Design a protein with these regions (language model features):
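Broad, structure-driven detector of short, well-ordered beta-strand segments within folded domains
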Residues: 97-105
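Helix N-cap / beta->alpha transition motif
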Residues: 63-66, 102, 128-132
Length: 165
């Protein structure tokens, strides 16, 4: 796996991709959530980025200001009793669909497909990457084509709710 700095350099060299200047780290509730090291490094080096904006499936890694709890945006409320209350928006497709990242200590860094029809639904909340670095690497390799986790050759990483009672 490449490191964050290498991945950002790669994005800067790709056509139809933009890297924003760094501004600040995202603000999270430090009593409940923590930023993974690779995410801290990402936001210290850049302020978000856009991958393959002229392709069929562009994706935006959000700015620190847009890095917010997902449930109030996607569901309309926090849903504190659900594990999805620990998920933050990490990407959007510019059309109202999101990818999220878990900031709870137990599942730190796991990334999920949080499109409107499957976000926070048991059995439908697919783990699409094990860390932010893993997600960024896979999105770059995907070249703006059909979502990699929906392709038949994608090896399942399980569901967000698999280890829930």
């Amino acid at each position: 796996m490449e490191n964050i700095n290498q991945l950002i350099k790669k994005v800067k060299s790709l056509p139809n991709c933009r890297v924003q200047e760094p501004t600040k780290l995202p603000i999270v509730d430090k009593n409940k959530h923590m930023l993974p090291g690779d995410l801290k490094e990402f936001y210290s080096l850049c302020g978000g980025l856009t991958l393959f904006e002229n392709e069929e499936y562009p994706i935006h890694i959000v700015t620190p200001e847009e890095f917010i709890l997902a449930n109030p945006v996607i569901v309309g409320e926090l849903c504190e009793e659900d594990i999805s209350s620990n998920w933050y928006i990490i990407c959007n497709d510019g059309k109202g669909e999101y990818l999220t990242i878990n900031l709870s200590e137990e599942r730190l860094g796991r990334c999920y497909d949080s499109f409107f029809d499957r976000h926070g639904i048991v059995g439908e909340s697919q783990i699409i990457a094990t860390s932010f670095t893993d997600l960024l690497e896979k999105l770059i390799k995907n070249n703006g084509q059909y979502w990699y986790w929906l392709k038949s050759e994608f090896e399942s990483l399980g569901d967000a709710y698999d280890d829930q009672e």
